[in-house]
UniProtKB/Swiss-Prot annotation:
Alphabetical UniProt keywords: Membrane, Mitochondrion, Mitochondrion inner membrane, Transmembrane, Transmembrane helix
Annotated disulfide bonds: none
Name of the molecule in the record: Probable cytochrome c oxidase subunit 5C-3
Family named by the database record: Belongs to the cytochrome c oxidase subunit 5C family.
InterPro entries: COX5C
The organism of origin for this protein: Arabidopsis thaliana
Role description: This protein is one of the nuclear-coded polypeptide chains of cytochrome c oxidase, the terminal oxidase in mitochondrial electron transport.
Cellular localisation: Mitochondrion inner membrane
GO cellular component: mitochondrial inner membrane
């Protein structure tokens, strides 16, 4: 019988360009999520102080 050729995966070193693209993509995604979180917190703070300034809410507990 003739020898069968089996395709084996050849191991290569890390691809620098691929690593940079993956790192950049993950970094931008994480940064975008962080900025969205930060903007949401800023909005909550701004709404709180607007309500406080208009007198609709108070931070002092009224005693009865």
């Amino acid at each position: 019988m003739a020898g069968h050729k089996i395709a084996h995966a050849t191991l290569k070193g890390p691809s620098v360009v691929k690593e940079l693209v993956i790192g950049l993509t993950l970094g931008l995604a994480a940064g975008g999520l962080w900025k969205m979180h930060h903007w949401n917190e800023q909005r909550k703070t701004r709404v709180f102080y607007d309500l406080l300034e208009r007198g609709e809410i108070g931070v002092v507990v009224t005693e009865e």
